[in-house]
Amino acid sequence: MRPKNYSQMEKPISITTGKFRTNNNNNHNNVWFVVPLFFILCFVLLCFDYSALFTDTDETAFSIPDVTQKSTSSEFTKDDNFSRFPDDPSPDSSCSGRYIYVHELPYRFNGDLLDNCFKITRGTEKDICPYIENYGFGPVIKNYENVLLKQSWFTTNQFMLEVIFHNKMINYRCLTNDSSLASAVFVPFYAGLDMSRYLWGFNITVRDSSSHELMDWLVVQKEWGRMSGRDHFLVSGRIAWDFRRQTDNESDWGSKLRFLPESRNMSMLSIESSSWKNDYAIPYPTCFHPRSVDEIVEWQELMRSRKREYLFTFAGAPRPEYKDSVRGKIIDECLESKKQCYLLDCNYGNVNCDNPVNVMKVFRNSVFCLQPPGDSYTRRSMFDSILAGCIPVFFHPGTAYAQYKWHLPKNHSSYSVYLPVKDVKEWNIKIKERLIEIPEERVVRLREEVIRLIPKVVYADPKYGSDGSEDAFELAVKGMLERIEEVREMMRQGKDGSDGFDDRDDYKYTFSPYEEPQVLA
């Protein structure tokens, strides 16, 4: 936090005046002409000297052009009464071990991206700017068609996760402006939005430029030296693989942010983790951002009371370009099952699957929601299905089980059905038959567990959470703090904090850890 910028009249400069005496009456007028002039000169000199103590020299801000020093706080919160850094509580308060320090990055790394949102594209949409409003939640949904609650539903873009998380962090109750108290350091770089500007038609030098500039800035900050960056973390609304380009071939996808030597010391939270141990998955943002516990409870009760018309549902489009995709088989079986399966066709030109009214209308009427991998392992749809109380059915462990360890139960059979498909050529699953086999008692238990998970996978209003409730943000912060503490404990014991920190673990995406057959009873 920058020191207060005092005006000349506000600066706490104290001048003590004395009484001058003279025995020369003839010089009296001259003396009293000189004395005021002397004091005026002293005052001016003191002002210039003292003002140096109050120059805008934020210890977290490296010497950079003035344009990058623009304060970002007002860009991320609409609450004029909010104090970015509350008074640090006493060391024995509930914030002990939970303090987080937020770097005030140069403006080009976050706020400037929002100011120039028209330069960012989703690939399927020309204008991402409307999604920035309302803390990054996007426009309020007004035509809820008696499907959604009358409030707290928004048209949310998954790429806005970094903006949503930043707004939530600004309102985190255990912020500190004293980095020596902090257990973790948050780096509010909008990595996904930055890279989205350069994914198509730009060379790797341009794609990697912001990553290099960020790391150059971070490593000279005093906070970096404490743990060589291993207590630092950032968040992205893109999958972690987008930041792990493994070659310098111009045709390769993404940036090399996570392969830069300094960046390997940091952790990244994103909608999908990679094979590296310092990448962690947190939920995709859904379109429900409740303002209170009462709203969550109301929604949960609505989902419990639903009479579900369809046995299973699939919302998506075929992926014929991916030879290993199971989607074609799933769509075929859904069409064969007629009234027992509902197909929400999300192919271009069909139903708008970004509209939560369309998605929730189907999911809330289905017992099971099929969740095959999409363009990558994970799908936002799985969190929409949880939100609707629809039991997710997974075909690959990388879609959920290897991902959201802080948010979903370790016992994956308690909330989902697993039908592993290692090779689509060997597809021998009859989805309808497998789902019908599950006893009604177990279906009820599964649905109840899914509904119980709803508070853990939503990003609530930034003011929400002060009552001790844990939403997706709170659980992500808790998980990150625990991981950093593990590294810190290693260092206390004289061990190398880098040992295993950024190792690669491809095993977690294989079927082997999850090969035990599920008990359907």
Curated annotation (Swiss-Prot):
Region (Disordered): 72-92, 492-521
Basic and acidic residues composition bias: residue spans: 76-87
Tissue: Expressed in roots, hypocotyls, cotyledons, leaves, stems, stamens and carpels.
Residues annotated as signal peptide: none
Topology term for the membrane: Single-pass type II membrane protein
EC category: transferase
A GO molecular-function annotation: glycosyltransferase activity
Database matches in Pfam families: Exostosin_GT47 (PF03016)
Positions annotated with a glycan in the UniProt record: 81, 177, 203, 249, 265, 411
GO cellular component: Golgi membrane; membrane; plant-type cell wall
Cysteine pairings via disulfide bonds: none
Protein's UniProt keywords contain S-adenosyl-L-methionine: no
Stretches in topological domain Lumenal: 52-521
Cellular localisation: Golgi apparatus membrane
EC number(s) given by UniProt: 2.4.1.-
Keyword set includes Nuclease: no
Transmembrane segments: 31-51
Keywords: Glycoprotein, Glycosyltransferase, Golgi apparatus, Membrane, Signal-anchor, Transferase, Transmembrane, Transmembrane helix
Cytoplasmic side stretches: 1-30
One GO BP annotation of this record: protein glycosylation
Known role: Functions in xyloglucan synthesis by adding side chains to the xylosylated glucan backbone. Involved in the galactosylation of hemicellulose xyloglucan.
Family assignment from sequence similarity: Belongs to the glycosyltransferase 47 family.
This protein's name: Probable xyloglucan galactosyltransferase GT14
Organism ancestry: Eukaryota, Viridiplantae, Streptophyta, Embryophyta, Tracheophyta
